[in-house]
Curated annotation (Swiss-Prot):
InterPro entries: Cyclin-like_sf, RB_A, RB_B, RB_fam, RB_N
Keywords noted in UniProt: Cell cycle, DNA-binding, Nucleus, Phosphoprotein, Repressor, Transcription, Transcription regulation
Keyword DNA-binding: yes
Organism domain of life: Eukaryota
Biased composition regions of type Acidic residues, renumbered to the chain: 107-119
The protein's name in its UniProt record: Retinoblastoma-like protein homolog lin-35
Entries under CDD domains matching the protein: CYCLIN_RB-like (cd20548)
General function of this protein: Key regulator of cell division which acts as a transcriptional repressor and negatively regulates cell cycle progression in its active unphosphorylated form, but allows cell cycle progression when phosphorylated. When unphosphorylated and in its active form, interacts with E2F transcription factors such as efl-1 to repress their transcriptional activity and negatively regulate the progression through the G1 phase of the cell cycle during postembryonic development. May furthermore act with cell cycle regulator cki-1 to negatively regulate cell cycle progression.
Gene Ontology annotations of biological process type: cell differentiation; embryo development ending in birth or egg hatching; embryonic digestive tract morphogenesis; gonad development; negative regulation of cell cycle G1/S phase transition; negative regulation of DNA endoreduplication; negative regulation of G1/S transition of mitotic cell cycle; negative regulation of mitotic cell cycle
Length: 961
């Protein structure tokens, strides 16, 4: 593979920032001030929002001399950079000022803008960098602080997941991520120039690590998801733009090769007043890249027209010259233009597939008004050869450092291989250059990723056009989509039909049971070593529930219970009994290995609610493995456990049984999602008494970090150490300890946010909602969930989301009807007919003679303890008109007038979601307790202190972790 002309290893576009070795501090174990964050700033506590809401110039003329051009270029480039930097600083100051006055339900945390890559990494046990990492950094001349910070970021990712593939590629992606984290703002408008430019071109670093561009971008995109910081959306958008820009440049470069061979003749060796073909090709392509960087859009058509405009300008000036570069012109091409009396733009559009009218319009109204600094304004090589060659190069290299982009001069072949452009321009492979490293090593997964990308693009072309063109969406226009057949990674085949799928599930169940017997089992052994063996309690529960399961199943099938019970039902009962005992064994053994106190563990095991939940899980496992058509919550009703309490053990069971198949895990994930979206909000749910004691408004915002430590319910936290009967309030009602309640609610709230974010992101994309409208929609949902939680009682999560989408569309003056939004909702995989046809309301609200308005000041406790009112169901449009609209009258005005910085950005829900992650004791993973954050006095604390000085006492609750 020939060497590329651009950016060889060890060549930096700027001088190093220091003279000493950049690895001395790393090897010595010291830390730089730029990468240390001793204590994160205090997080605010959410308040009720109602308490806060009371009141280019074109450069003309030719170059006269070398010094004039140099001074002009440096001055204009410097002034442009300074002005843009000042604008970014002003945006930062406005962001900081707005935080003091923004509504808590709408804004972000009251912390400053931290360096994203430094704010969440535990640096106490970071091992020293590997030798290969240091060698790559040394070859790229990276500053010491970047070497240290990038290695800490890489080590943080290694501790979280197992990184497969080239270690050097992941280390390079960590460097790229760290450099972007220094330059990308978390808030405010999306920037085109980084706050802190790169010290070295990223292509130089990639060549130093011998990694291809395609592999670097692929690994960086995945690295962003692994870290999953608060700025993940900004990172993904930035990398997406870089990838799209490269894709456009690939197409344009291949077209440019054909055009260059058509207009110019090959001159292998240049002279003082006439460059070689390789030099002319390099200057033209670099000039195009400089102008391309100033385009507000980066689509293929606009770049195509930009290329035509540049060639038109160059050709026009060359024709006016008698010596020098004019010798490059292809005489046959010139004669054809003169013979047909045709302009070069018309000729290029005719021969290479462009629109003459669009190209002329772009040239007259866009290109001629663009700033021309950074590209040659004369092509007199005899007088200004060095400047013509260096000015575009310098301008483009400054752009690369300011934006962190890939050097697209990588496509230019070396001098030795340049003759291939003239020999076979159509067969010159551009995309392959991105797949090969500096030494010629090919990216193994490049072809596979290309196929996936092509299929994704074709799907977007097939479906995306309808959303933009069709304003009215009707059910008759929807085309049924054939679902893809899922390849079974565990069995190595495709499921032929439902029967074979059920058979594979049953085989997996048989594998879980194996030859397990109670006699001489670990369960019997461990229980025997306890001071008060729980074996009798477990066996009694097993016998009681299996009998109930058998009776219920037989009664539904119309059979009588006698000695002639079918053998099949008997086998199912035995399977259920064994599965229950196996899971109890795994739970007890695993918890004892964690050094859990025996007293705490016995309290959990003897709790009826816990045993019923575990048995309910086993019933679901038996039903799905044997192909029984008993949709959830049939198993919960059988076991007498509420779905909200049952979903708390799902993570526990999946974590302790590693032999569950993918289909089994997906089945329980769907059940958990059903509980979160509907069953938890029923009026009889245990969730409501917990919310009364610890409202959602007391919890801090999660941002976009779905992967913090509180993702799973702990078995020990399932019950307090003291029995519930021992803790009662003044009215005799049982009190759930605050630490347990807050932990349970925090995990549930996080999962609710994740589910809502995923549904809302899909729905808002389908209705073509803009970025500001999405933030408004998420801000409204967040306010309702935290400050008006009662609106969710007896309702489906999607019902609230649909209403939020409709009202935001209305305040943004959209003409889309509610029925059209419902049509888009029906396209979601998790849609339900009952969502928009059966919304619970009170019967008194529908009284035609005297309809009762909704009481927006009613509390959850008043609803629970008050007299039960008659309920009925209506369609979602009627519900919106009689209740939802009245509940949001106040907040919607604040959201409508709020600035973009005051609105909450919709978080990104990763594909893996909150799926339980199995972590075993054999894993090389160190879990350390972080020191407690020292919070400063918040606004709420200061307000309460002022009230207490006036003689008013207010009790403030904090949510526990």
């Amino acid at each position: 593979m020939p060497k590329r002309a651009a950016d060889e290893p060890g060549t930096s576009t700027t001088d190093p920032f220091h003279e000493q070795s950049p690895f001395d501090a790393v090897l010595a174990g010291t830390e730089t001030t730029d990468t240390i964050c001793e204590e994160p700033p205090a997080k605010r506590i959410d308040l009720d929002i109602k308490q806060e809401f009371n009141g280019g110039v074109q450069s003309g003329g030719l170059i006269k001399n070398e010094s004039e051009l140099t001074q002009m270029t440096i001055k204009q480039e410097t002034e442009g950079n300074i002005n843009e930097a000042r604008r970014e600083e002003e945006d930062e100051e406005q962001d900081e000022d707005s935080r003091t006055s923004m509504p808590p339900a709408l804004g972000e945390d009251d912390d400053y803008e931290e360096d994203d890559a430094d704010s969440f990494i535990d640096k106490t046990n970071t091992p020293p960098p590997s030798q290969s990492f240091l060698e790559g950094c040394r070859a790229a001349n990276l500053p010491n602080d970047i070497v240290t910070g990038a290695w800490e970021t890489y080590n943080h990712a290694v501790q979280r997941v197992s990184l497969e593939g080239s270690e050097s590629a992941w280390q390079l992606s960590a460097i790229y991520y760290y450099l972007l984290s220094k330059g990308i703002k978390r808030r405010g408008k999306t920037i085109r120039i980084l706050i802190q430019p790169f010290p070295v071109s990223i292509l130089t670093i990639a060549n130093s690590f011998d990694i291809s561009v395609a592999e670097m971008l692929d690994k960086t995109a995945r690295f962003v998801e692994i870290i999953h910081s608060r700025k993940i959306r900004r990172y993904q958008e930035y990398i997406r733009r870089i990838q799209e820009g490269l894709a456009v440049s690939c197409v344009i470069f291949k077209k440019f090769c054909r055009i260059f061979c058509k207009i110019f003749e090959e001159i292998k060796v240049g002279s003082e007043n006439c460059p070689s073909s390789h030099e002319l090709f390099t200057v033209l392509w670099t000039s195009f890249l400089v102008m391309k960087s100033r385009m507000t859009v980066d689509d293929l058509i606009s770049n195509y027209q930009l290329l035509f405009s540049i060639l038109d300008q160059v050709y026009t000036e060359m024709c006016s010259m008698k010596e020098g570069i004019v010798h490059h012109l292809n005489q046959k091409f010139v004669e054809d233009l003169l013979e047909n009396d045709c302009t070069i733009i018309r000729a290029l559009c005719t021969q290479f597939g462009g629109s003459v009218l669009d190209a002329r319009h772009f040239s007259d109204h866009t290109f001629k008004k663009m700033e021309k600094t950074g590209i040659p304004s004369t092509w007199n090589f005899q007088e200004f050869r060095d400047l013509i060659m260096n000015v575009p190069k310098t301008a483009y290299e400054n752009y690369l450092l300011q934006r962190g982009s890939i050097d697209e001069r990588i496509f230019i072949p070396s001098v030795e291989d340049f003759s291939k452009i003239f020999q076979s321009p159509d067969t010159y492979s551009v995309a392959d250059i991105l797949k090969v490293s500096y030494s010629g090593r090919r990216f193994r997964d490049a072809e596979f990723l290309t196929k996936i990308s092509n299929n994704h693009c074709l799907e977007k072309l097939a479906l995306g056009g309808k959303v933009a063109s069709e304003k009215l969406v009707t059910q008759s226009k929807e085309q049924p989509r054939v679902p893809c057949v899922e390849y079974n990674l565990e069995l190595g085949n495709y499921p032929d039909d439902l029967e074979s799928n059920n058979q594979s599930l049953y085989n997996r169940l048989t594998k879980i049971i194996g030859s397990w017997k109670l006699e001489n089992s670990k369960l019997e052994e461990v229980c025997g070593t306890m001071s008060d063996s729980p074996m009798a309690t477990i066996l009694l529960k097993s016998d009681e529930m299996t009998n109930k399961f058998e009776r219920t199943l037989s009664a539904e099938l119309g059979e009588t219970i006698n000695e002639n019970i079918p053998k099949y039902h008997y086998n199912v009962r035995k399977e259920l009994e064994l599965v229950f005992l196996i899971f109890m064994e795994k739970i007890i053994v695993a918890e004892l290995k964690k050094k859990v106190r025996e007293e705490d563990l016995l309290n959990v095991i003897r709790r009826e609610e816990f045993l019923d939940s575990v048995f309910c899980f086993c019933v679901e496992l038996i039903l799905v493995s044997n192909g029984y058509d008993r949709p959830f919550p049939w198993s919960a009703e059988l076991c007498g456990v509420h779905p909200f309490m049952f979903h708390k053990v799902i993570d526990l069971m999946i974590t302790h049984e590693k032999q569950l198949s993918r289909q089994m895990v997906q089945h329980f994930s769907r059940i958990e999602e059903t509980v979160i979206e509907y069953f938890s909000w029923k009026s009889d749910s245990p969730l409501w008494p917990m919310v009364v004691r610890c409202p959602f408004a007391h919890f801090q915002e999660f941002g976009e970090d779905w992967a913090d430590k509180l993702n799973s319910y702990s078995p020990i936290k399932f019950t307090p150490i003291k029995k519930p009967d021992d803790l009662r309030d003044e009215l005799g009602r049982p009190i759930v300890p605050q630490n347990q309640t807050s932990r349970t609610l925090r995990i549930f709230l996080k999962r609710t946010y994740f589910t809502a974010a995923r549904r809302l992101q899909d729905l808002t994309d389908r209705v073509s909602m803009g970025a500001r409208a999405k933030s408004q929609c998420w801000s409204l949902f967040d306010y309702l969930l935290r400050n008006d939680t009662l609106i969710f009682m007896d309702r489906h999560l999607d019902q609230i989301l649909l209403c939020c989408v409709f009202v935001i569309m209305k305040i943004n003056e959209s003409s889309m009807l509610f029925t059209e939004i419902m049509a888009q909702y029906r396209r979601q995989s998790a849609n339900s007919l009952l969502v928009y046809r059966s919304v619970t309301v009170f019967q008194e609200q529908l009284n035609p003679e005297n309809p009762q308005a909704v009481n927006t000041k009613e509390t959850i406790l008043e609803r629970l303890e008050g007299p039960q009112k008659e309920k009925t169901t209506v369609d979602i449009i009627k519900y919106y008109n009689i209740e939802f609209r009245d509940r949001i009258k106040y907040i919607i005005g604040q959201i409508d007038s709020a600035s973009d910085e005051d609105l909450m950005e919709m978080p990104v829900a990763t594909e893996s979601g909150l799926m339980p992650v199995r972590v075993y004791l054999t894993h090389k993973l160190s879990i350390q307790t972080l020191p407690k954050t020292k919070h400063g006095e918040s606004k709420q604390e200061r307000a309460i202190a002022n009230l207490e000085k006036s003689g008013i006492t207010i009790a403030m609750e904090r949510s526990g972790d």
